[in-house]
From Swiss-Prot:
This is Iron-sulfur cluster insertion protein ErpA. The lineage of its organism: Bacteria, Pseudomonadati, Pseudomonadota, Gammaproteobacteria, Enterobacterales. The keyword Coiled coil does not apply. Belongs to the HesB/IscA family. The gene is erpA. HAMAP family: Fe_S_insert_ErpA (MF_01380). It comes from Klebsiella pneumoniae subsp. pneumoniae (strain ATCC 700721 / MGH 78578). InterPro entries: FeS_biogenesis, FeS_cluster_insertion, FeS_cluster_insertion_CS, FeS_cluster_insertion_RrpA, HesB-like_dom_sf.
Length: 114
């Protein structure tokens, strides 16, 4: 997708850079980072991340730095207006989702309710 089109989900430079390095380590340029939402966690829904070389019908792909972030339509409806970022700190390193649709989140930030 073009950089001048408003996207429903932001894929940050830090996240794209980390994905680029992880894909290089796997030696499979077809891999993309898939973010998804499942039921569970202490707040009702939880975020999940996996590498996937498949893009399914209806999936949205956001390209940055030559790598892709893939989101299925069911998950996207809960993520609109949010961002996928990557952080490194005292708590470790991880991909994180900032979700303006979440009414509450758990302490670790991996689950939420709407």
């Amino acid at each position: 997708m073009s950089d001048d089109v408003a996207l429903p989900l932001e894929f940050t430079e830090a996240a794209a850079n980390k994905v680029k390095h992880l894909i290089a380590d796997e030696d499979n340029p077809n891999l993309k980072l898939r973010v998804y939402i499942t039921g569970g966690g202490c707040s009702g829904f939880q975020y999940g991340f996996t590498f996937d070389d498949q893009v399914n019908e209806g999936d949205m792909t956001i390209e940055k730095q030559g790598v892709g972030l893939v989101v299925d339509p069911m998950s996207l409806q809960y993520l609109v207006g949010g961002s996928v970022d990557y952080t490194e700190g005292l708590e470790g390193s991880r991909f994180i989702v900032t979700n303006p649709n979440a009414k509450s989140t758990c302490g670790c930030g991996s689950s939420f309710s709407v």
